[in-house]
Amino acid sequence: DPLWSRGLGDVYKRQRLVYCSVTGFGQTGPRAAEPAYDFLIQAMGGLMSVTGERDDKPGGGPQKVGVPIVDLTTGVYAALGIVAALLRRSQTGQGEYIDVAMLDVQVGLLANQAMNFLLGGRVPRRTGTAHPNIQPQRTFACADGDIVIVVGNDAQFATPVSYTHLRAHETRED
């Protein structure tokens, strides 16, 4: 326990206390005492393996997310844990210790990739702006710049197709 190891074991006398610890790698294990940074966790946790352009495209290869997504998401998870603990305390009178590790949070962000692998045997890979499961859903180059098309089903796809004055069967053949 982080409080006990810092000589703050008396905190246990305060049964209503809610406290949260945020670390890079958790309280135990070979990296428990090591510092962590968003970029490092993205690389170690596999997020960069699915972020960026495909390897066969110019600029392909691992990329970090453009915002400190692990830092931000870890903060949200910690805050949610604290709010849940405060709610529990209001109902039971008991405090709580919340332990949030950045690596755990980042691996949790890969839930869809894990599902694709565990259920379908598909190894996650970088797809650029394309979605790994839903097509068409990506950036398309146009004469005057790029356009993003996002559709979730055939009915949604019919709308942009009608705007382009193409027949749906011609688009399917392309």
Question: Where on the chain are the PLM-derived regions?
Answer:
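Oxidoreductase and adenylate-handling cofactor-binding alpha/beta cores
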Residues: G75-G95, G108-L119, V161-Y163
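Flexible, acidic loop-helix segments that line cofactor/substrate-binding pockets
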Residues: Q63, E96-I98, D104, R167, ...
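The feature captures the short pre-catalytic strand/loop hairpin that immediately precedes
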Residues: G45-G66
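A short glycine-threonine-serine/GTX helix/turn-capping micro-motif
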Residues: P62-T73, G95, T127-H131, Q135-Q137, ...
